[in-house]
Amino acid sequence: MERYESLFAQLKERKEGAFVPFVTLGDPGIEQSLKIIDTLIEAGADALELGIPFSDPLADGPTIQNATLRAFAAGVTPAQCFEVLALIRQKHPTIPIGLLMYANLVFNKGIDEFYAECEKVGVDSVLVADVPVEESAPFRQAALRHNVAPIFICPPNADDDLLRQIASYGRGYTYLLSRAGVTGAENRAALPLNHLVAKLKEYNAAPPLQGFGISAPDQVKAAIDAGAAGAISGSAIVKIIEQHINEPEKMLAALKAFVQPMKAATRR
């Protein structure tokens, strides 16, 4: 959890926002997945958001569902994912690592065991995509017992009550949802986000990172101009993996070429 605090403090000093890529662990196979993560970090990723392959990913679009299917095809299991997480943590001791996942995977292990395992391998945060704030008590309590930040999604239409709950229960960062279909509608989307960012700040919420539909440097810049602490990009990165599935070296080069300007856009 503290890794997020020190990251945001360092970035503030350097007048930068955070660029956070999302990938599915084990896509397209364990070995290449580790190379992908090293490449993202070398290219400037400030933190990682990682998915554990799950058979019924509700909140994911087709791109990330395909990533899950590729990981399954490679025989990747949740147990292997935790081994990979331990390896990433050994190699990169300071980078914040977040998991984005579904409640079933947590239940399968037992809520407390799941968060204990996260703590053991060095995971900093967990966002359980299909658990709303009002049902989150057993998850967030187990998370805090094991030094893991519970992350909550702040939708663009969040009312005051929800904003207060997110501020009070969330740690690490707040996942600020871009308006649905933000691309091409940045100007319309910027207004409500400014308002949400101001409210979250007022209620002392964890720093907001804007996610969903972030695929170009100007969107990263817009998120930071609206007051977000950074931006999360998932589908755009997973698409690059998909496009170069049979060319592992080209894939890594393309990922690097994508991440560098995205990170550069966070510099004020």
Curated annotation (Swiss-Prot):
The positions making up the signal sequence are none
**GO molecular function: any one?**
tryptophan synthase activity
Q: Does the keyword Lyase apply?
A: yes
So where's the catalytic machinery, residue-wise? Answer: E49 (proton acceptor), D60 (proton acceptor)
Reading the lineage from the top rank, the first entry is: Bacteria
The chemistry this enzyme catalyses reads: (1S,2R)-1-C-(indol-3-yl)glycerol 3-phosphate + L-serine = D-glyceraldehyde 3-phosphate + L-tryptophan + H2O
Cross-referenced InterPro entries, in alphabetical order?
A: Aldolase_TIM, RibuloseP-bd_barrel, Trp_synthase_alpha_AS, Trp_synthase_suA
| A Gene Ontology term for the protein's cellular component | cytosol
The broad enzyme category this protein falls into is: lyase
List the EC numbers from the record: 4.2.1.20
Has keyword Amino-acid biosynthesis? yes
Q: Print the keywords alphabetically.
A: Amino-acid biosynthesis, Aromatic amino acid biosynthesis, Lyase, Tryptophan biosynthesis
Pathway this chain belongs to? Amino-acid biosynthesis; L-tryptophan biosynthesis; L-tryptophan from chorismate: step 5/5
Pfam families assigned: Trp_syntA (PF00290)
Family per similarity comment: Belongs to the TrpA family.
Share what the entry says about its subunit structure, partners included. Answer: Tetramer of two alpha and two beta chains.
**What PANTHER family does this protein map onto?**
TRYPTOPHAN SYNTHASE ALPHA CHAIN, CHLOROPLASTIC, TRYPTOPHAN SYNTHASE, ALPHA CHAIN
> What's its job?
The alpha subunit is responsible for the aldol cleavage of indoleglycerol phosphate to indole and glyceraldehyde 3-phosphate.
The name this protein goes by in its record? Tryptophan synthase alpha chain
Organism expressing this protein natively: Escherichia coli O127:H6 (strain E2348/69 / EPEC)
